[in-house]
């Protein structure tokens, strides 16, 4: 498994709405993520800084990257644009994090 982590932002007034939309996520989106090899996906909210920290284990970079081109992912991104900063393609603005420590 490949461990990935990334950081995103959430609008200051949208913490509760962001959480509501993820509990639960759309079943179709969950199915796409799982079918593309995503496991143990978690997102954490830092309320003080309006930051979201995400971790996920993936089976391959290619399969993970392919999620972005699915119709359900495109719809999800559009659905989330009013609660978080987005790129021109509606994907969330995010930065990959470098792993500096891991205790198996």
From Swiss-Prot:
Pathway: Carbohydrate metabolism; L-rhamnose metabolism. Keywords: Carbohydrate metabolism, Cytoplasm, Isomerase, Rhamnose metabolism. GO terms for biological process: rhamnose catabolic process. Transmembrane segments: none annotated. It comes from the Bacteria. One of its GO terms (cellular component) is cytoplasm. Substrate binds at residues 18, 41, 76-77. Gene3D superfamilies: 3.30.70.100. It is found in: Cytoplasm. The active site is at 22 (proton donor). It is an enzyme of class 5 (isomerase). It catalyses: alpha-L-rhamnose = beta-L-rhamnose. InterPro entries: Dimeric_a/b-barrel, L-rhamnose_mutarotase, Rham/fucose_mutarotase. Pfam families: rhaM. One of its GO terms (molecular function) is L-rhamnose mutarotase activity. Its main location: cytoplasm. Its EC number is 5.1.3.32. Involved in the anomeric conversion of L-rhamnose. Homodimer. Belongs to the rhamnose mutarotase family. PANTHER family: L-RHAMNOSE MUTAROTASE (PTHR34389:SF2). This is L-rhamnose mutarotase. The lineage of its organism: Bacteria, Pseudomonadati, Pseudomonadota, Gammaproteobacteria, Enterobacterales.
